[in-house]
Each structure stands twice: as C-alpha cells, then as structure tokens.
Amino acid sequence: MDLQEKIRTLPTGPGVYLYKNADGEVIYVGKAKNLRSRVRSYLLEASQANAKTGSLMREAVDLDYITVGNEHEALALENNLIKQRKPRFNVLLRDDKTYPYVKLTLGDRYPKVFVTRRLRKDGAAYYGPFFPGNLAYRIVDLIHRSFLLPSCKVDLSRYHARACLQYYIKRCLGPCVKHLTTPEAYREAVRDAQWFLEGRGADLERSLEVRMQEAAAAEQFELAAKYRDLLVTLHQLQEKQRVASADDDDADVFGYHYENGMLAVNLFHMRGGKMVDRREFFWEELPEFMEEGAQEEEVLPAQAEGRGEVQVELRFEPGAFFSALLKQIYIEQPYVPRSIYVPVNFADREALAGLLAEQTHHRIELAVPQRGDKRSLVDLAGQNARQSYEQRFRVMQPNQKAIQEALQDALMLEELPRRIECFDISHIQGAETVASMVVWENGAMKKADYRKFQIKTVSGVDDFASMREVLTRRYRRVIEEKQAMPDVILIDGGIGQLRAAAAALEELGQTTQTVASIAKREEIIYLYGHEDEPIVLERRSPVLHLVQRIRDESHRFAIAYHRKRREMRDRDSELLEIPGVGTRTRTRLLEHFGSLRGVRKADVEALTAVVPRPTAEAIAAHFQGEKAEPEAAAGLVRIDESKTV
C-alpha cells in the first residue's frame, strides 16, 4: 500500500502519526484530533508553504500511526516519541539543556545523592530543578557534610577492604566497609536527607532535636554537638534560600520580542514570590510560525497590463509558537510550577494545562494575564526580551558589511550591494502557475516589499516564459514609476531561467543590470554574461548562506501563493466529499451561509435550517476534524540558548 492510499484509510479518531523515509527512519512525529483529516492535509499541500515541510514530504515514503483515547494522551505520546526517536524535522531542544536536579538513588542498598541533568525512570527520587544551577551543587555538598552520605563514586553494591579518607575525617559514614556503619544508621541519614530535600524542615528539626536530647542524656556529647550544628545549619539555610517546590508562589513568566524575522524570548523563574533566574532564547527565521495575509491591489482596467502584483504581509504567529515551546519545556518534566504566564493565547492552551495537571497531580494555571501584577510581570519579561534582542541581533550588524563586500567581489559589482530582488516560479504540471518576488535590503529581508504574481500569458509548463513574463511586468512598472532598480536580481533556477530573465530586462532597455541565478542541487551561482564561469563558493561561505537564504525565502513564498490559489479553486468541491451533500445541497449551503467559511463555522442546529439533521451532523463532524491544532503543536522549531538557529 503506497503512502497516499495509507493516508486515505487512516482512522478519524485522535492519535499520533510518524512519517518515515526510504530507510525506515522516523523523520517526523505529529499528533491530531482527527488522524485522517490532519494527515490528509499534507497531500492537499503537495507544494508546502515552507521549505522545511516541503523537504519533509519529499523524503516521506511511509507512515505509521497510533490511536489513543483523547487529546491529552496524544499530546503525551507525541512528546514521548519525539524525545525517544529525535526525528530530524521536529526535535526542538538541540542539546536538551535543563537546569540541574538532585538525585537520591533510593533503589540502591546504600543510596547516594548527587547532581544530575538527566531524568530517568529508575526508581530514584529527583528534586528540583534548582535555580541558579550552582544551588544544586551547594545543596548536595551540604548533604554530604551534614548527613555523611558518601560523595565518592565507589561501588557500594559490595564491601571493600578499607575506607577512604572521607570516613576518617568524619565526612562519610563508611558504608563501603563492613561494620563501619549499620544499615539502620544509614537509612536514618538517608531519611534526613530526603526530608531536607522535600522541604520538610519542621519534621527534620523535630527529629534532630529528639536525637540531640537523647545523645546528651546518654552523655554522647560529641554526637549531641553534631546534631546541634546540623540544626543551626538547617535554620540558616531556611532563612537564606528555599528548596524548589510546587507551591502557589511558584510561576514561570514568558515574554517575547519579534522583529525582522528574528525572535527573542525571556523566561522568568519565580520561586517563593521572588525571581530567582532568567533564561534567554533566540531564533532567526521561523517560517513554520508565519501567517500571511495577501490582497490583490486594485487596478483600473486600463492599468491591468503589468499589474496583478500582490503585496504580502507576513505576520508572526506567537500563539502557535508558544504552544510548541511550552510542550517542549514542560511535558514529562518532574517539576512544573503551578502557574505559567504567557503573553498570548493559543488554541490548545486549556488542553495543555489539563495534561500538565494530570502529569503533576496538581492544578496548573496556564494563563494570559490581562491586568494587575501578573500582567506587569509578563510586560517586564517582554521588555527584557526586547533588550535581549537588541544585544543579540544588533551585534550581528557589523559583520554584515563584510558579507556584502564579499558578495560584491563574487558578482563583480562596482558598488556594495544594498538591495537584492529574488524571483521563483511555482506550479504543479503547469497548473495555477504563480511567481514570487522577495526583497533583501541592507542586511535583512524587507517583507513590506514582497510581491506575488499570477502568470497570465503562459499556458502549460514553461518556466522560462513564465520568468520572462514576471520580470517584464515587474520592471516595466519600476521604470514607469521611476523607481530605482535593485543592485542584483537573483533567479531561483539554472542558466535557462537566468537567460530568460536577462532577455526580459534587455527588452526593457536594462542591459547593464546585474542578474544572477542559483541552481538548487549544485548550489552554484551563475552570473549573466559569465555563464561559462560559474561561481562555486565553499559550503560554509557566508555569501553562499546569504544567497541560499534569499532563494529559500522566495521559494517558500511562491509555493505558499500557489497553495492558496489551489485551495481557492478546490474549496467549494470540498463539500461534495461529505456524505449526503450533492451539488444542489452545496449550492444551498453556500447561498445560506455566504461562503465555505460560514459553513465551516456553523453548528449542527444552524445547519439543520438548510439540510436534514443527519447531513448536518456529517457536515459538522467533517469540519470539526479539520479544526486541528496549529502545525507548530507538534513542535517544529529548535531551541538553542547559545546559538542563533
């Protein structure tokens, strides 16, 4: 059974799906309320709206799925499979960096206590996370000194001939040598350490006071002094710091700043009502979380020729982003604060809060504060994110000139390139052919100047003619309106597309314009007039990376526009896929509700005004299955606290 046939036979309940490549390797894991509807959307988007998803579908040759009982189970299973398989297309944390925990190996004959960043289901007790990170090491050192648990790496599953120095300086009970301590005494020390780590200070104090009095009564004054010193240390520690626990004053607060395709996020860790730490995250380019709104410019009939451009407005979707981010940070973690405050709402916020509550066995407040102190905290996190953005991304600018100078040399330009316009063509076997133009200016993508075109004069598959039409329309208008030509025109394609573009410019009298192209597979740059001398740059060349980035952005915009036009063409026919809906019923539904969107939003009662109840229920069920979470709910970004992605 091929991939498309397998997708058509998927069940309609909730579950998790796994895409595999030709080697049988899992390359992507996702979840869905309705498996068939969600996975089928990949077929409907044969030309995906971003380069990453397009790459996924080009590699995917097989599909597995697992059905579950509800959305909570799907969330948990998806996260678990991502962590186990680490699929290339949706691993979020590049290094799985976490704050440290204190581990107490309760399953061992003689338990040890030490710091770890790796959490396992091994019967041990984990405490934390601790903020800042060095607090965990200070806590463990205090436990070693106070409760005399071993700090060495000696194997305690068997006895040894002699004890180490730690025993003789009274820093260890010596469980490595038989008869130096008793199992009862060691268990008592472990219990003390456990109470201490669990924040049961009052219980520990009472126990120490009783033992101190008993030792004094038995005239064991050295032992009594030890308990006294331990009580003093415990009092001092409780005054200065608090072991991490899940009380009502614990909260994580998020803020973000997005600008020019780059994102900074700040995370405040509030413990006991006080901010104990701050984390920063950075991303550069997040196509998975961009939404576009495009409206064709109004033109008079007499102006139609040379027009038809589409101004594209890209909007960052913070809700979808935070949905993915929070799942990566909190699902299957032993500690989750009772309150998590985010700056924006997202579709599955309540479902995620419910899953985390089941995971932690206490209520989780996952909220978007609107006023008061909580809102002030979110605003403060946002202000800090803006400062982080300034410090991180502004320092990148000095390097930009060096890259521009290198590009100037590579393309033999007389002046430093400040504006590049890049074009790409998209179609499926000649159907709904469209083109995109993206703009790079002074070190950043200038999204306000992006344009998209519907090909009007070319029928069938002819990329060269399509490219010629687009450049003719674009630069005829530039010339008529006396706008400046770009420093470089970049074409996504090979020599054929390059020459077609140059021919269009020459017809407009632009014979000195610099035109270059980049071939997809070879990643070779061709310069018009020097096609026999291709520019081959090193794979790590910043100039090649810049050209690739611009080319990939243009490709993404072209296929996004192509998908939108195809969806507009096919949207009315979607109703015909629903049992009980024929052409007449479809017409009545569209007339009554005004559009497919109106039908999609209607509930069963509203639909019964037009169709019988069984048909209304079928329509509602069909569209309910398509109200799946945003693509990012499966987690489609990488997190790196030290590098720009």
From Swiss-Prot:
Query: Which keywords fit this entry according to its UniProt record?
Result: Cytoplasm, DNA damage, DNA excision, DNA repair, Excision nuclease, SOS response
One Pfam family, please name it. HHH_5
Q: Does the keyword Lipid metabolism apply?
A: no
Membrane-crossing segments per the record: none
SUPFAM superfamilies (UniProt xref): C-terminal UvrC-binding domain of UvrB, GIY-YIG endonuclease, RuvA domain 2-like
- GO CC terms in record: cytoplasm; excinuclease repair complex
Compartmental location: Cytoplasm
The residue stretches assigned to a coiled coil in this entry are none
A GO BP entry is: SOS response
Locate the GIY-YIG domain: which residues? 12-91
A molecular function GO annotation: excinuclease ABC activity
Q: Which InterPro entries match?
A: GIY-YIG_endonuc, GIY-YIG_endonuc_sf, GIY-YIG_UvrC_Cho, RuvA_2-like, UVR_dom, UVR_dom_sf, UvrABC_protein_C, UvrC
Which residues does UniProt assign to the signal peptide?
none
- Residue span(s) of domain UVR: 202-237
Against SMART domains, the record matches this protein to: GIYc (SM00465)
User: So what does this one do?
Assistant: The UvrABC repair system catalyzes the recognition and processing of DNA lesions. UvrC both incises the 5' and 3' sides of the lesion. The N-terminal half is responsible for the 3' incision and the C-terminal half is responsible for the 5' incision.
User: What does the similarity note say?
Assistant: Belongs to the UvrC family.
Assembly and partners?
Answer: Interacts with UvrB in an incision complex.
Question: What protein name is recorded for this chain?
Answer: UvrABC system protein C
High-level lineage: Bacteria, Pseudomonadati, Acidobacteriota, Terriglobia, Terriglobales
